[in-house]
Every structure is written in structure tokens, then in C-alpha cells.
């Protein structure tokens, strides 16, 4: 049969209306006001502003206008927090803490915010002509695309792409150790086999030879599996490094701190259309010849 999700429609979420907790999807035609809490089990759409509020979303979040907060303390806390299982799309974000399970798309600007996603972050409109990423810390798993990154006389913009890289490195180390153990065991078996060949021909020698052959077959099977896992892990690492890029459509300002897969770089001057990526064990800033297409939803705020 057809499954119909429950949808709750509200005008404004303010002190008069109260906090909202709903298991289905929520459409708010107005604003989510200061100090309010909205929890949606499904998707959440806000036609207006989200101002110093707390949002928890089980699906995707769309904010037609902006998500705005203010700093709470010197430790970096913000008055506006968003935790979303799916993707997040908003026109602008300022002094907010946003974590999403899917991609995060901000149409015009992200200012002094903390952004986290295992996916990609895009700060750009559909035409890639505006979109400023200034200040704050953005930690993503795949790629960052913005029109302008950093600002004149600003050195507080931090961009980190880590994703699965630490996990892949740890697994690679583990597989390498397993391969070495298997190779040592096979070498020890060679020594044992040489000693058996020196024994007088008889039942005992034959028994030991059969046992060694069975053990060799088992060890060789393990070693082959481990070598295949090594190749797979290396391919996954290479694929991650190939797509872990920061793409800047117009201006990258000096003082932007970048970390990709554990390697660090600080932009030393202003760059025009460029990309930052991993190359031969270092991060490099190179000209960007083509931007990826805009594959985001047509519902993205413009």
C-alpha cells in the first residue's frame, strides 16, 4: 500500500506557541524564534528564519532564509544548534553549530559557524557567482566548494577534510601487520619442511609432510586474502585523496587554515579561482579550470 507520512504545519514557533516535538515531518511557514526547540522525526521545512533556536531533524532540513545565532562563550559555543540526520540547505548561516548526516548546502554565506558533515559542504548559489565561507570551523568528509573563502584581514577560517582517512590508515596498518605475520609463518614452515626432508622415509615423515602441506595451503589462502585486502584499502585511500578537495570559484584569501587527510597548509596570499588538494604527499594550491555541476535539489533556497 501507499505510506503517507504525517505532516504538521505551523505558522511561527515562538514562546507563545511553545516547543515542538513531532514524529513526522514539519512545515513552518514563518520563523523559529529565539530559545525555541523543534524536533521533527521526518523532514523539517522553515520558510523564514531560525534564530538562536535548537533543531533536531530525522530527515532533511530546508531553511528558506537563514540560520542565525550568536557566540555564547570564548570556548566557541553558539546559541543556535542544528542536528540533522539528512541533508541541510539554507540561504545563509551565521554563528551556528550545524551537524548533518548528509551534504550541507548554503546559498549565500556561512559566517563564523561550526559545520560538520561526513558528506560535502557547498557555499554557493546555483550560478556559482556568490557564496562566502568566512571564519569558523568546517569539518567535512568529502569536499568543500565555495565562491569566496576567507576575508581580508581575517585568519579565523579553518577547513578540515578527514572523512574515512584515519580509519583507512588504521586498517591499512593492521592489514600490513597481518601480511608480515603470514609471511613469517610461511618462512618458519619452509624451515620445518627442510628438517622433515632430512628425516628417514617412513610413516612419521609422511604424516608431518601432509600436516605441513595442509598448513601451507591454509597460510597461503590467508596471505592471498590479506594481499587482496591491502590492494582494496590502498584503492580506497587513493580514491579518497582524489576527491578530497577544496574548490574555490573566485577568491581564496590569505590566512585560511586547511587540513586534508592530516596534511596542513595556510594560504599565504590571495588566489583567484583555485583548488587545494593532496599531491605527492603534500597539499598544493592550483588553478581550477572547471567547477563540478550544481547537482543539489531544485528546492534549494536561492
What residues fall within each predicted segment?
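Charge-rich, low-hydrophobicity low-complexity segments
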Residues: 1-118, 122-123, 132-137, 141, ...
Amino acid at each position: 500500500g501507499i505510506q503517507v507520512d504525517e505532516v504538521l504545519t505551523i505558522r511561527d514557533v515562538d514562546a507563545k506557541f511553545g516547543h515542538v516535538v513531532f514524529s513526522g515531518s514539519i512545515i513552518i511557514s514563518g520563523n523559529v524564534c529565539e530559545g525555541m526547540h523543534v524536533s521533527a522525526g521526518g523532514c523539517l521545512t522553515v520558510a523564514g528564519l531560525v534564530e538562536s533556536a535548537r533543531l533536531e531533524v530525522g530527515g532533511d532540513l530546508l531553511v528558506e532564509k537563514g540560520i542565525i545565532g550568536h557566540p555564547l562563550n570564548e570556548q566557541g559555543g553558539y546559541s543556535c544548534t542544528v542536528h540533522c540526520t539528512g541533508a541541510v540547505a539554507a540561504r545563509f548561516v551565521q554563528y551556528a553549530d550545524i551537524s548533518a548526516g548528509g551534504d550541507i548546502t548554503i546559498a549565500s554565506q556561512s559566517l563564523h559557524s561550526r559545520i560538520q558533515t561526513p558528506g560535502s559542504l557547498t557555499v554557493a548559489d546555483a550560478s556559482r557567482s556568490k557564496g562566502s565561507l568566512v571564519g569558523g570551523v568546517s569539518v567535512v568528509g568529502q569536499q568543500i566548494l565555495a565562491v569566496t573563502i576567507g576575508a581580508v584581514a581575517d585568519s579565523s577560517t579553518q577547513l578540515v577534510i578527514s572523512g574515512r582517512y584515519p580509519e583507512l590508515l588504521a586498517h591499512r596498518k593492521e592489514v600490513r601487520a597481518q601480511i608480515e605475520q603470514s609471511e613469517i609463518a610461511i618462512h618458519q614452515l619452509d624451515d620445518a619442511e627442510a628438517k622433515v626432508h632430512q628425516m628417514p622415509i617412513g610413516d612419521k615423515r609422511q604424516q608431518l609432510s601432509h600436516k605441513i602441506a595442509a598448513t601451507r595451503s591454509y597460510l597461503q589462502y590467508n596471505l592471498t586474502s590479506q594481499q587482496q585486502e591491502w590492494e582494496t584499502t590502498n584503492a580506497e585511500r587513493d580514491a579518497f585523496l582524489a576527491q578530497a578537495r577544496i574548490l574555490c570559484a573566485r577568491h581564496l584569501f590569505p590566512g585560511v587554515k586547511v587540513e586534508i587527510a592530516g596534511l596542513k597548509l595556510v594560504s599565504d596570499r590571495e588566489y583567484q579561482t583555485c583548488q587545494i588538494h593532496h599531491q605527492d604527499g603534500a597539499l598544493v594550491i592550483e588553478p581550477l579550470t572547471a567547477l563540478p555541476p550544481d547537482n543539489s535539489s531544485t528546492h534549494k533556497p536561492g
